[in-house]
Structure formats: structure tokens, C-alpha cells
Amino acid sequence: MFLFSSRRITSLRSYTIIKHSSCYSTLVSDGNIFSIQHFQSLMQKYESNLKIIHQLHSHFTTSGFLLLHQKQNSGKLFLFNPLLRCYSLGETPLHAYFLYDQLQRLHFLSDHNKSLPPFDSFTYLFLLKASSNPRFPSLLLGIGLHGLTLKLGFESHVYVQTALVGMYLVGGNMIDAHKVFDEMPERNPVTWNVMITGLTNLGDFEKALCFLEKMPNRTVVSWTTIIDGYARVDKPKEAILLFSRMVACDAIKPNEITILAILPAVWNLGDLKMCGSVHAYVGKRGFVPCDIRVTNSLIDAYAKCGCIQSAFKFFIEIPNGRKNLVSWTTMISAFAIHGMGKEAVSMFKDMERLGLKPNRVTMISVLNACSHGGLAEEEFLEFFNTMVNEYKITPDVKHYGCLVDMLRRKGRLEEAEKIALEIPIEEKAVVWRMLLGACSVYDDAELAERVTRKLMELERSHGGDYVLMSNIFCGTGRFLDAQRFRKQMDVRGVAKLPGHSQVT
């Protein structure tokens, strides 16, 4: 066991006041080796700091630390598995495989026998999670790991087998996922939930519901996963029906996450009565005083269901000490949706007086309010300049879109075109598309042609652009030009997505 000198202990304590990476470099620069306990404490403390995780990885595999502790196999696992876990769940999951490979090589170099390194089931659990990480999923690596887990005798380890099910589902391989699931000697609620989640993410709600029915002990996660899945794929009626069924079930009660999942379905339908019912339910369950996320979502739902009065009443009932930036932004956005520009601006100024600084989403909300509420151009530009100069927020395409929207609503299309040309952002097709819509309103075919040329430079596969330009030509009597655009659409194989309505 290696002990720290007093100088090194002092350095360790300075972590709280010095930049993490600089302090870490100071600790290891003289070549002294960490103790296992110290390594573990660093992992626990900085598991979300990717830079320090990389430094620990480097020190772990290159400094001789592993060789000095080679007799403490359990110690190596305690150090290796947390590093692996951080990588598998983080932004660089492939580093988990690099680390695993390095440890194998070091083991072969340090031991006379050539047996497999002393990894445990958690090692392969984290490697499987790395292979199913949404950022860089790798079914090929996962299949290789499947074979290795069988060779090592982990077919009876429920968490390893559950990770295999998840890996196959993330890779879209439902057949092998079912096979692993069916062959498992033991399944726990996590296994069932992984299966339900995977099927829901793949859009197979029928099978997901089938597994929900078969599940021996349903959990709130099981219900919420499918409810959230329905809401995300624009099936609000199905989400609400399943939520109603869940509420009627005595054994399982919705939690805060369930409420956050169902509210988008409620406002998607614009069902004010259902919104009130959900509000009454969460009040009865005591969620509103406890969870500000539920409170903010209810404000948003009331506004999007068309009842700005209920949204505002609910907002003012919340003590200022509980309101966060999302609360204020939600209410400002609610006023913007209803064209109440003055009220939104007043709300923004109240927020500033309380010392809350807006973020870029807040600024989009207040700029939209100025545009939709018909406020003076000077007031809009004042907020835009405040955002840039006082709050140091760099405008993105949505902020510029608000500016173009304000100008187009006032019929100043040429000025809007100049702004669109000057936007220093590549992803600006949405701004040009907004301007093309304004050309349709004002029957400005000449400007529409220029705008369409810009859109074609950025994105040629958007069917709506061709159709809108064709309609503008028809509206100004240029039928041959309209026919030409329709032919271009056919030649380029561009499809127009059909519209749909939920009104029955």
C-alpha cells in the first residue's frame, strides 16, 4: 500500500479550488503511484469529467501502476470497471474497448500464464452497454462479446443477458433479442423493461404491449415507457388510453416521469378537460408542490390547450422561490403562443428584476412574443441587442428566424432577404423557407425565385419548397413556370409528404 506525503495530501485537497485537469497533472507529474483507494475516490468524484477520466485511463495503463498491483486482482477490477462504466455510458463508448484491449495486453505481459485476464461479469456488462450506446452503437462488437460471454460461462448472469437483449434491440435485431430473452434461466423486472423499451423504440407497440401483459410484476417504468413512446411518435390518443388504464390499475400508480410523458400527448390533442383531470390527479398525489418539472409542464400544457388564463393562474400561485428559469421561459412562451406580446415582455422584465439571467431558449420565446404580438420593431431589436451585448448569447438560426419573421409580418421582405443573406450560420434553410412562405402571402414571385434558388443550394430534397414555389407561380398567373417546377420535382425524385389532420 502506497501512502501520500503531506505535500501530496495538500495537493489533493486543492482539487476544490484549482482546475481539475491542472491539479491532476500536479499529482502525477513526479511519477509517484496512486494507491488503489485514492484511484477509487478519484473515479467516484470525477466520473462525469471526461478529461480527467482520460487522464486516469492513461495513468492506469502506462505508469506502471497496474504492474505494481498485479497481485491484487480484485483491486484491478475495482479500478478497471468504474473506468469502463464511465466510457460505456458517456460520449466516447469506443474508449471502453480500447481500455479493455490495453488491459488484456498488460495482463499477458505481466503474467507468466496466458489465462484470460481476471475480468468479471460487470466488465462484460459495461462493454455490452458500450456497444449499445446510442451515440456509437456497434452490433458487430456486441455479437463478438456475446460469444465471449458464453465462453466465460456468463449465460446464467441475469444482468449480462439483459445487456445482450438491449444490445440486440438497439441494433434492430429483434430475432436474436427474443432468442436471448427466451433462453434466459432467470429474468428480473429490468430484463422485461429493457425488452419493452427496445420494442417501443423500434415502433413495435403491439409486441411491447404483449410483453407488458405477460410481465409477471409490472413496474411504473413498464407503463411509462410505452406511454412516452406513443407520445413521441404522435399517437396521443393511444398514450392517453394507456395512461387511463394505468391509473385504473390499483397496483401501479404513475410517478412524476409518467406525468411528464403524458402531458405532451394531452396538449397535442388540445384536450383541456384531460389537462384539468391530469392536474387534479397530480395535485391529489402531491406531485405539484414537490416537482417543479411537473409544474412547468402543466403550465405549458394549459397554454397549448388554449387556456392561457389557467396557465397564468397556475404560474402566479407558485412562490417565486420555487420558480426556476424554465418556469419563466414556459410562461413567456405561453404568452407568445397566444400573441400576447406585451404580457410576455412584462413577464421577461419581472424575471430580470428577480436576478434570473435568460438563456437562448428564453430569448427565442421573448423574440417570438415580440414578433407574434405585433410589437414595435425598436422593442424587438432592443431585446436582440440585449441578448448579444448584455447576456453574451450568440444568436443561432432560431434567433435569426425570429428577426426574419418579424420583418415578413410587416411586409418588409427585401429587408428580411438581406438578413437571411447575412446570417453566419450554415443551417439556415429554415429561415429561407420562412421567407418563401411570406412570398406566398404577398404574391412576390420575383423574390420567391431568388429564395428558392438559395434553398436549392442548401437542400434539394424538400418537396414542400417545390410545391410552394409552384403555387406562387400559379397565384401570379405563371402556369408554365409552375409546371416546370413540378417536373423538376419528379425528375429529382422528390416526394411531398401528405398532410394529415387529427380533426374527426
From Swiss-Prot:
Cellular localisation: Mitochondrion
Region (Type E motif): 431-504
One Pfam family recorded for the sequence: PPR_2
Major location (coarse): mitochondrion
Organism whose genome encodes this protein: Arabidopsis thaliana (Mouse-ear cress)
Protein name per its UniProtKB record: Pentatricopeptide repeat-containing protein At1g09220, mitochondrial
Presequence boundaries: 1-87
Keywords: Mitochondrion, Repeat, Transit peptide
GO cellular component, one term: mitochondrion
Similarity field: Belongs to the PPR family. PCMP-E subfamily.
One GO MF term attached to the UniProt entry: RNA binding
Residue spans of the PPR repeats: 76-110, 120-156, 157-187, 188-222, 223-253, 255-289, 291-321, 324-358, 359-390, 396-430
BP GO terms, sorted: RNA modification
Superkingdom classification of source: Eukaryota
PROSITE patterns the UniProt entry points to: PPR
